[in-house]
Amino acid sequence: MNRPYNFSAGPAAIPAEVLQQAASEMLDWHGSGMGVMEMSHRGKEFISIYEQAEADLRELLAVPQDFRILFMQGGGLAENAIVPLNLSRAATVDMVVTGSWSQKSLKEARKYASEVHVAASAEDSGFTTLPDPASWQLSRGASYLHLCSNETIHGIEFHELPDLRALGSDAPLVIDFSSHVASRPVDWSRVGLAFGGAQKNLGPAGLTLVVVREDLLGHALPACPSAFDYKVVAENQSMFNTPPTWGIYIAGLTFQWLKRQREGDLSGIAAMEQRNIAKARLLYNFIDQSQFYVNKVSPNARSRMNIPFFLRDETRNEAFLAGARERGLLQLKGHKSVGGMRASLYNAMPLAGVEALVAYMQEFEQRSA
């Protein structure tokens, strides 16, 4: 079966091998007589799924032993509230605002933190650039600094995480890596907490990944619900309440798929990074040489995962989308807040899918000349 290429920003494409394995195990997981959705989360069958998923993720992302991996619920949007509920007790919260998602983070932090300070913003550029870390106005003794390391809507990415200590701050760095998790390595020496919804690169909607340094546990505000208290969740191995069992299972299969990936001598996340660089380069290079399409983001800030682009003649938008659907190129419409088109090139998108998109874009440009 030749499946269409799904460029959705999330929920997004899941590797076909993962879907096929899940389908084969739907009625009977490993001879248990049960599907995973039917299992008790405290039964030995699901415990083995959970433990393997956690171990595989720790290996893939090279998560240090002094970090805890939590499988939670609520998505990245809920984490924008859960983070300040856990970390904002001491002092000011610093925020770097680079697009729609960090704007949402700012709004939520202001509900719970006693003081929120915008250390830097790219709003004046229309969210087409990244503020130079050397220019950030960092607060003394901040509880944490939050940034969205990949802005899904505006297509902006920090390819290198800032070193806050080198900038004179002892604040832990909190990153929302929802839309680039597992697409590239993470420098954990620069991170205190990372969170992300699973529905872009890890599996289905409903699962949220949190990776948090142990010294950041136990600082929740009194008003923080127990189910959102990172210390409580960690002490209960992500099972203080019933976890999203199906999401953890599919994520676990995705982790195993990632471990099998190879690019030359590279494997796992390193292989995926090289593959993702190649996919993004192919599409950006075509857009940049075109007289018909445009990407507005500064080259050094461009996301590898989410590539917005615009037709110079926007009256052709609907025709472009209709032709794409006819060719099996799905969900290319841009976010309603910015318009245009958006191609999301998550891990499950093969290079062949990007090649098919570029071929169609070239054909459409020629027909529209």
Swiss-Prot record:
Any single GO BP term: L-serine biosynthetic process
Gene name of the encoded protein: serC
GO CC, alphabetical: cytoplasm
Entry protein name: Phosphoserine aminotransferase
Domain of life according to the entry: Bacteria
UniProt record similarity statement: Belongs to the class-V pyridoxal-phosphate-dependent aminotransferase family. SerC subfamily.
Keyword Glycoprotein: no
EC number, UniProt record: 2.6.1.52
InterPro entries, alphabetized: Aminotrans_V_dom (IPR000192), Aminotrans_V_PyrdxlP_BS (IPR020578), Pser_aminoTfrase (IPR022278), PyrdxlP-dep_Trfase (IPR015424), PyrdxlP-dep_Trfase_major (IPR015421), PyrdxlP-dep_Trfase_small (IPR015422)
